[in-house]
């Protein structure tokens, strides 16, 4: 018995000795030792303490315990290979969270008028502080803009003037001036503004607002942001910058808004910063000076994890139960060039040459940049049970947009599971929920992805049939919805590119995707998409189609439900000599719009064992003018049927098919689409639900745009 007790005591002591506990508190000090009684103050201090202790052979790793409360952090925590033992940062389990905040709190507003407040930010003049986002009581507020938020200005005429004819490839000029004539003049405060472009730009010539007005253009799938150079008495705006892509230029079908001019300050929730440091704000309904707190983000990033090479990586870092909130983005002097999916825009958490980096039960919110990026040479990392919302760009990014010569540096085996990823792209509307660039063997599963202005999940980064490392990516059991908001075009709930053998897009629920012009698709296999299995998805209420393939080969579209798309149910574009895709065992159900469009009847595909049904008895099932009988005579859908699938309750969103004879005939295997989305506690699942007001706003927007029946492009 004595021996057993002694052995147990020894095991207990050695277990305690293996992991060193450090403690951090908002009332701590980084000169302390990091004990319970003498806690540290910052994460940086905890890392420094761990580095100092790690040579002790009795220590196998560290747990950094963060007391509840708010930790102000204006600079990113940088972790490199100087820390070579595992470390876990563990937040509080109490009702009060452990919060890393990158913001300072402004003083209390004072009233200028009944509906206009102001507060002085002395750091603007004293230290040259700049900011382009603010948060009121934890909610994002937008700089004064014209037209007001949710509205856009049209363009009457655009004149492109190359001033640097250096061809950057594919007819992209090095630099050009654009003269933009809007449909209606924008009410800028001064008739003429001048701003130099470049790193050595002089201070603003605008004597009211700090910084020049910015113009954000929406063109097809991109946005471009440029400072205003000049506006003449007729309202013609002059801007300059790198040439736009000729295949997605700024033209009369583009739209825009202008921001950062005192004349635009006219709507609830708008704000503007004067050059002498006064922040002016129009309060929203219910806000009083006494109950309003203004947060001004200072930090741009929270965490930077950087190994040295694929041979010398940072390893084994975990963040548990910590909130990261309030981070800034500052527009460069020259603005932002167009880039699909805001590809080059960073995140508040970034890792390079790192493995076994894990985020669990964390929050990332209120940012100017995106959320998390496992960028170069990362593997075996994860984001699980995290709430990532109200971000300026994309929420999760995996891999790089370039292919390195050393293929070992390709990021792989990243897991993104059971996260709520919502309300994104507020600074960069072309951003996406989750994007996988040149990266393989990743899992994006059981996430709720909603309220982005563009695509939900993007996979692959090669346009065509050239080499792509984006293989064997798993996009399954996600709930992807309420995307587009009629701001951009050419988007998908799930969007793929390039040779993607082994990739699965399955068991997802995708709905309510609405583009401005063309291309509001549920499932979208774009240029070169190859070897992708698409099955057991429920897709409904998308503008342009439940499925669209631009071009690709050897894709399998099987056992899906495509129900009630708005304009078209199915689309395909490029005719190629090979088999583009197989389309079988699917249910296509609709009441409005047409059955198929663009080039569906001509694209090389094999279609069979499908069920087609239109609830409008006056409409015939046709394939771009080809009757069902004629379609079968062409060798397509020989074993397919026209039959009512007898969904349980379409109005209530219950798409369970009850027509057993039809199911047997086409070989459809019912799947439980209720498993898509987040899982866990009832509270977690409820948190993923959009508010009734948001859903109603989306429905109203769709109704309004459908009344206009915009068909450009």
Predicted segments, located by residue:
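Bacterial Sec-dependent N-terminal signal peptides
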Residues: 1-19
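Extracellular polysaccharide-degrading/modifying enzymes targeting complex plant/algal/animal polysaccharides
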Residues: 19, 23-358, 363, 404-405, ...
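Extracellular beta-strand solenoid repeats
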Residues: 65, 78, 88-90, 101, ...
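Predominantly extracellular beta-rich ligand-binding scaffolds that present long acidic/polar faces
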Residues: 74-88, 531-652
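Short glycine/acidic-rich loop motifs that flank beta-strands on beta-rich extracellular proteins
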Residues: 75-76, 300, 328-334, 368-374, ...
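Beta-propeller domains
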Residues: 243-250, 260, 287-312, 325-328, ...
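Right-handed parallel beta-helix
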Residues: 315-326, 355-366, 378-393, 406-425, ...
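N-terminal catalytic cores of secreted or lumenal carbohydrate-active enzymes
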Residues: 341-343, 353, 375-380, 399-400
